[in-house]
Structures are given as structure tokens and as C-alpha cells.
Amino acid sequence: MNIKFLHIIIFVSFLLPACQQGKRQPDSTSNVHHVVVCWLNEHGNKEARQKVIEVSRGFSAIPGVIDVRAGRVIPSEREIVDSSFDVAIYLSFENEQKLFEYLNHPIHKKAVEKMLKPLVRKVVVYDFIE
């Protein structure tokens, strides 16, 4: 199997459906936080890193998104800190339903397909609710 194709499959499997919870009903009253940690195809590439950051900030135009933050890693010598990634993205939503809507929104889908997938080799997503 082509290694690039495998990376794309892994990327899609983490980024798109990682936040969906089967048939469980979303909590409609609590803020939801969505943290996306990205490793670039070309680790340390400043242009690619900036592109991911800029594209991510555009997610603020999606209804239900309260806040979007994106930035680069802070290198650290501390053992507990994983500073192997390139970019982290943080989004907050009004509730779980808005997170699900964001994942399927055309702006998000287009950004993932056209701009992020070509630049990112690995993604890890953390979702939590207050």
C-alpha cells in the first residue's frame, strides 16, 4: 500500500469522525472544546505551519464556533511535554451539536480536503466538555 495513501487514511480517520459519538445524544447546554494537534509532512516548515494556522483561524466564520486559536509548538526540555508536533488548533463551541455541525460544514470540509490534508501527516484530536 502506498505510504502517502495510508497517511491520508489515518489523517481522515482522526480529523473528521473522531468527535462523533455514535447514537448518544449531544449535550445541548455545555461548552465543548476541540483540540487538534498536527504534525506537518515537512516538520518545522514555517510556510506550511503558517498556512495551517491561517486556514484554521477561518473556522471562526462557521456558526456555533465561539473561539478559534491556532499556533506553533513551544519547544520544551521537560519530559512530560510532547513538543514533537508543529501546530495546535483550539476551537470552542456552544454545545456538542455545534461541534457536529462544524465537522460537516462546507468551510471545514473544504479546508481539510484542499489545504490541510496536503500539508499534515498526522493529527490527534482531543474533545472535552465543561
Predicted regions and their residues:
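Bacterial N-terminal signal peptides that target proteins for export
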Residues: 1-7
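An amphipathic, aromatic/His-enriched active-site/gating alpha helix that lines ligand/cofactor pockets
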Residues: 54, 61-63, 92-125
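Intrinsic low-complexity/disordered segments
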Residues: 4, 17-18, 30-31, 105
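Short S/T/G/P-rich N-terminal loop/turn motif that feeds into the first structured element of a domain
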Residues: 19-85, 94-98, 128-130
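Bacterial N-terminal signal peptides
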Residues: 7-17
